[in-house]
């Protein structure tokens, strides 16, 4: 068997190899738009149970695989999953999202953080990733993921989702030393978590800095980029050839800066035209994205046209097709099926 037949398509594209077609997966491809997931959620209402009980997390991760055969199967988890292992417990309330009862507001709390040992605090990750690898074999690429330091710090400091990030920005601009100390600790823990996911079987890992798009470019350079880079540098020192993706929501203002983090692939959201993203990131940077998730509410002809447009603009090297954000609740499952089907046959439409 040749190397290309042995190695999954998305992994080859992530490594920068020439591939026979553009690989495709979707952020949040396992989730609430699928009836099979909603039925399981009725039975197991706790999000943490669904994501930390290996049998449930494996079943959920594989739901879109069985339905649509995407080129990437991402483990069902949450970016906050490692926080309890750092001494920051959280819960996820269905209608409210994540809640952290004792948000981090002082240097004393930062100093009291627990040393993070992923094998000890997250043993279920090994089971989930290992089983996913066995289940999909070489037919798909298994993706892991982590939250980036700024975004995890934002949750831990705000205590919940925020519209204006006033509490973390207050700390950033009035007590920057406390925030830098916290970000450094998170970066080191997340680097260890990435390495652990690699050792457990992940083949590509995406780092979500979901809230970094809320920073001005100069503050991104101060509070987000150095800690993204710290994670990447630590991982690359141990696993230099492992493909890493960086995703930021609302990243138009910091796109070039994302490329400076050291990642292999920049995941572009839909607020940037893919042709512009290619130009701004340079010919050597691989890209992922970037169809507006709302497109999947449109007609199938409309969906097909947007797929063709994105693939044309991205070109035939170093592109992983994806949405510019997670698939939206209420998206018709048949349109998701059509999306994957069309993506896999897109070469015949070009």
From Swiss-Prot:
Enzyme nomenclature, EC number: 4.1.1.37
Record-listed substrate binding positions: 28-32, 78, 155, 210, 325
Assigned keywords, A-Z: Cytoplasm, Decarboxylase, Lyase, Porphyrin biosynthesis
Residues carrying the site annotation Transition state stabilizer: 78
Signal peptide bounds: none
Residues spanning the membrane: none
Name the record gives this protein: Uroporphyrinogen decarboxylase
Species the sequence originates in: Picosynechococcus sp. (strain ATCC 27264 / PCC 7002 / PR-6)
């Amino acid at each position: 068997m040749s190397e290309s037949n042995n190695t999954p398509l998305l992994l080859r594209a992530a490594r920068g190899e020439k591939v026979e077609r553009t690989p495709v997966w979707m952020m949040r491809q396992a989730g609430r738009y699928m009836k099979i997931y909603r039925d399981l959620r009725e039975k197991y209402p706790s999000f943490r149970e669904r994501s930390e009980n290996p049998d449930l997390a494996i079943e959920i991760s594989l739901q879109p695989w069985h339905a649509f055969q995407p080129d990437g199967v991402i483990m069902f988890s949450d970016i906050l999953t490692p926080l309890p292992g750092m001494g920051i417990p959280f819960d996820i309330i269905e209608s409210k999202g994540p809640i952290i009862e004792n948000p981090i507001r002082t240097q004393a709390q930062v100093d009291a953080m627990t040393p993070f040992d992923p094998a000890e605090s997250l043993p279920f990750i090994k089971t989930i990733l290992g089983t996913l690898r066995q289940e999909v074999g070489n037919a798909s690429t298994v993706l892991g993921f982590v939250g980036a330091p700024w975004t995890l710090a934002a949750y831990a400091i705000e205590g919940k989702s925020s519209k204006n990030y006033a509490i973390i920005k207050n700390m950033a601009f009035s007590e920057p030393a406390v925030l830098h100390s916290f970000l450094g600790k998170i970066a080191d823990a997340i680097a260890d978590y990435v390495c652990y996911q690699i050792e457990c079987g992940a083949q590509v890992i995406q780092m979500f800095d979901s809230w970094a798009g809320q920073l001005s470019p100069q503050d991104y350079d101060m509070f987000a980029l150095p800690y993204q880079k710290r994670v990447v540098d630590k991982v690359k020192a141990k696993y230099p050839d492992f493909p890493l993706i960086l995703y930021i929501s609302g990243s138009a203002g910091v796109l070039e800066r994302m490329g400076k983090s050291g990642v292999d692939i920049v995941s572009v959201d839909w607020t940037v035209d893919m042709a512009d993203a290619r130009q701004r990131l340079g010919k050597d940077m691989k890209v992922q994205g970037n169809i507006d998730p709302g497109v999947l509410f449109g007609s199938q002809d409309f969906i097909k046209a947007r797929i063709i447009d994105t693939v044309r603009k991205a070109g035939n090297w170093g592109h992983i097709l994806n949405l510019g954000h997670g698939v939206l609740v209420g998206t018709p499952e048949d349109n998701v099926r059509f999306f994957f089907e069309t993506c896999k046959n897109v070469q015949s439409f070009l």
